[in-house]
């Protein structure tokens, strides 16, 4: 058994518009499921919540104020996780999220 940590940055998981890259997320989840089936552990560390939130909130530019960034992140996080959860569930893998802050 091996343990993998996969870091996916915003530019990997989302277009500049904030739209999620379904093809990339699908391939990642396919690989996670294959490794899970072999008994490996996989942790996905993902960015993209702000980008997704910006699209949902129809923000034309990335916010600069911390409060606006937090709002976009809060809106986008659940929607981003839902995509991972659905893709992994379709492949027989249970997912969970852990939210970290600067102090973690």
Predicted regions and their residues:
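Nucleotide/pyrophosphate-binding catalytic subdomain
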Residues: 1-104
């Amino acid at each position: 058994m091996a343990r993998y940590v996969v870091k996916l940055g915003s530019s990997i998981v989302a277009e500049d518009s904030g739209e999620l890259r379904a093809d990339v997320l699908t391939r990642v989840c396919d690989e996670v499921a294959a490794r899970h089936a072999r008994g490996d552990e996989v942790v996905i560390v993902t960015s993209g919540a702000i980008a997704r939130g910006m699209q949902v909130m129809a923000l034309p530019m990335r916010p600069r104020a911390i409060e606006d960034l937090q709002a976009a992140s809060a809106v986008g996080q659940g929607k981003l996780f839902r995509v991972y959860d659905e893709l992994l569930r379709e492949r027989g893998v249970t997912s969970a999220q852990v939210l970290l802050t600067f102090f973690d």
